[in-house]
Amino acid sequence: MFKRSLIAASLSVAALVSAQAMAVTGGGASLPAELYKGSADSILPANFSYAVTGSGTGKNAFLTNNSSLFGTTGTVHYAGSDSVLSGSELTTYNSNYNGTYGPLIQIPSVATSVTVPYRKDGNTTLNLTSAQLCDAFSGAKTTWGQLLGTTDSTPIRIVYRTGSSGTTELFTRHLNSICPTRFATNSTFTNARLPAGGTLPSNWVGVAATSTVVSTVKATNGSLGYVSPDAVNINSNAEVSRVNGNLPTQANVSTALGSVAPPANAADRADPSKWVPVFTNPSAGYSIVGYTNFVFGQCYKDASVSTDVRAFINKHYGGTTTNAAVAAHGFIPLTPAWKSAIVSAFYTGTSENLAIGNTNVCNTKGRP
């Protein structure tokens, strides 16, 4: 279940070396990177590249078709992102590229938690409330004694993600729901922590990659971070804090996600923003949850790319083929209802003209 940092660290390098031979080029979020490529049970096809850049860069690369952001050349065919496409991003894409490239498709890949790894010598049962997370990550409380109501003078050392990270967006969305005067929802931690761009405590550490968060936390007593479930043992309270009494187990994440339904009418199904529910402060289960997503084009000039993307959609969403790998990496497979809705809209559907490669839409359009 637990993939080590060596694999994750090699993903971007592997993408650079092999991108020219790959038929389908993509990249983005580091949160699901080991699920996607580089592990024995990774779910992306062999001819799909995946450059680990973070969600913000991944979205930007796709939205502007800038493959240099993935360290390669040619067309960007897809992206992975835990950060939801904003209204302004969708508007800009539609204005600049929809007429030539065709519509984009944003769909959830798997459900995820954001876990809170820690090192506090002598404490293997840490349980923090959402309010305490606000205190620690805002810097309002600077020692563990202040945070936990003891005399412990150990400094709190926050390990945070630099750059634009979907994991940060998921995490700060929850914090914003609890302490909106201290946190905005943002994919960049230093912009999410208010005031944006404010000075951080000198002992806090910013790291660029998911794979570095846990090792940096473990290196120093008093450290606290946030990271994807793939990087930790989600069942071990000695490794990750409980939040409001709950560990980020698959059962607790499923409870938090509840029974939210996929888009139910044609107008919503045609709206990429409707396909990714967001969660701020679930009423039950683990408190920090969301989805990591794929962004595809509906239309590709290269018919083989369209065929390959369609085949992956059918494999990942058309049954349970990838469920074991998803669970082994600490994520939650989409429910049958969600999978069926995605297949019906973007693979088999014809009446609403949403399917990848639909000739009514893609006759003269396509990502080059």
Curated annotation (Swiss-Prot):
Coiled coil: none annotated. It holds the Pfam family PBP_like_2. InterPro entries: PBP_domain, Phosphate-bind_PstS. It is found in: Secreted; Periplasm. Residues 1-23 form the signal peptide. GO terms for biological process: protein secretion by the type II secretion system; protein transport by the Sec complex. Its EC number is 3.1.3.1. Keywords: Hydrolase, Periplasm, Secreted, Signal. Induction: Contradictory; shown to be induced in phosphate poor media. Does not respond to decreased phosphate. One of its GO terms (cellular component) is periplasmic space. GO terms for molecular function: alkaline phosphatase activity. It catalyses: a phosphate monoester + H2O = an alcohol + phosphate. Belongs to the PstS family. Has both a phosphomonoesterase and phosphodiesterase activity. Homodimer. This is Alkaline phosphatase L.
